[in-house]
Regions:
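Active-site glycine/GP-rich loop and adjacent strand/helix microenvironment
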Residues: 1-151
């Protein structure tokens, strides 16, 4: 059996509608596994059969406005904005991050699969063509460390 796993590097990439069939034709019996994650975090959000990502209970999501300066108020549990989070398992650095990802999240944890906890409905990137989007996890870490060293 072959396992095909796709990560977050495909936010600007559109696969053909029949990509799974093409992969199965080449490899045979394939199990598809998709997760959302990034190098700077200690967890992966697995995708359920309904196409949603489920965050680890060790992650405190902070959905921010596009500039990353303020929290966005949820509307009936759903909130869309820049994905920030506090990773409670980070132990060699501060666990707070602000990413360049634009997400829609259900903070009430409503998912047809029955799994509880925060549900990420969609993941994309803020359009860097509208301005140079320099907000990213590595920049968050750099700013924190630089601030700690300067102070």
């Amino acid at each position: 059996r072959t396992i095909a796993s796709f990560g977050g590097g495909m936010k600007h990439f559109k696969l053909p509608e029949d990509f799974e069939d093409q992969i199965r034709k080449f490899f045979g019996n394939v199990v598809f596994s998709t997760a959302y994650g990034m190098t700077e975090m200690t967890w992966l959000a697995s995708q359920c059969p309904h196409g949603f990502y489920h965050l680890s209970p060790t992650v405190l999501p902070l959905i921010l406005n596009e500039s990353g300066e303020a929290l966005v108020e949820p509307h009936e549990g759903l909130v869309t904005g820049r994905f920030g989070f506090v990773d409670l398992l980070a132990d060699i650095r501060w666990g707070g991050m602000i990413s360049g990802d634009k997400v829609t999240v259900d903070l009430d944890g409503n998912c047809p699969c029955g799994m509880s906890g925060t549900v990420v409905h969609s993941v994309g990137r803020f359009d860097s063509s509208l301005g140079d989007d320099k907000i990213q996890c590595s920049g968050t870490i750099d700013a924190y460390i630089r601030g700690a060293v300067v102070d």
